[in-house]
Regions:
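Class I S-adenosyl-L-methionine
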Residues: 1-154
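C-terminal target-recognition/interaction regions appended to catalytic cores
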Residues: 100-252
Length: 252
């Protein structure tokens, strides 16, 4: 904050000001990774539980029990991978009808009833980059897996320098990187692992990686949908936290 007060202290003051107590070491106890709870993505967030100070004598013991015993009971036995989450969705293939690298390339329409599984258009240049990078991972060559090689590739292909690397292929056999609200602008960092498809992930694929069921629809345009999905708390994580909080209420 501008006055130098750590965010954690402000959070503690905020809870205390309305009569609630939170765990004594938020950084140590409250950080949770959604991938531990069945969500196919690495997504670290703080889950802060507040208990009213006047409802029991030893709030800290209950808070410690919540983080160390109750919530961990709902962890999954194994982590869910990207391929397990989206691998059964129909392929969406690029329709390349031009050799102009700047031309916008469309994609085949998937034959499925699932909503929002539709690719956005990309330039031929980007399609070729996506295919090359996905094939680099799939083949095991791994020439473009570090920041420098990816930044150099961006400069070579786009003709501009970037302080950060702009490309990332989702690994089929691992959880995804964190789904973000500005995915509609940062699709280069969410490239589909299948080289044949040459694209970033669709809204439905992003929703599945957030653990939404396919019957969950999103109202709005594609940009609105990416934002809603990226800002959401993964439903599977929310369910686990809710069940754990329910146990705390039973104790109280």
């Amino acid at each position: 904050m501008p006055d130098g007060t750590p965010i954690i202290q402000l959070i503690e003051r905020g809870f205390s000001g309305i009569g609630y107590e939170i765990v004594d070491d938020v950084k140590k106890y409250a950080k949770v990774d959604a991938s531990d709870y069945g969500v196919p993505q690495n997504r670290e967030r703080l889950i802060i539980l507040g208990i009213r100070k006047d409802v029991c004598d030893d709030v800290q013991s209950i808070l410690h029990k919540f983080y160390l015993e109750i919530l961990p009971k709902y962890k999954s036995k194994k982590k869910t991978t990207v391929a397990e989450a989206i691998g059964d969705l129909p392929k969406i293939l690029p329709i390349i009808d031009s050799k102009d690298l700047k031309s916008r390339i469309g994609y085949s329409e998937p034959s499925c009833r699932t909503t929002w599984h539709k690719a956005r258009r990309h330039s031929l240049r980007d399609v070729e980059i996506y295919q090359m990078l996905a094939n680099d991972i799939k083949s095991g060559r791994n020439e473009y897996v570090d920041s420098k090689s990816l930044s150099d590739l961006y400069e070579e292909k786009v003709g501009a320098k970037s302080p950060i690397h702009r490309y990332h292929v989702l690994r089929a056999d691992e959880p995804s990187t964190t789904i973000i609200s500005h995915l509609d602008r940062d699709g280069n960092r969410f490239i589909h692992y299948d080289p044949e498809q040459g694209r970033d992930i669709t809204p439905r694929e992003a929703a599945r990686i957030q653990s939404f069921d396919d019957d969950f629809d999103f109202i709005g345009n594609q940009t609105d949908t990416y934002i809603m999905i990226g800002n959401a708390v993964p439903p599977l994580l929310a369910k686990c936290v809710g069940l754990a909080v329910s146990e705390v209420l039973d104790i109280l």
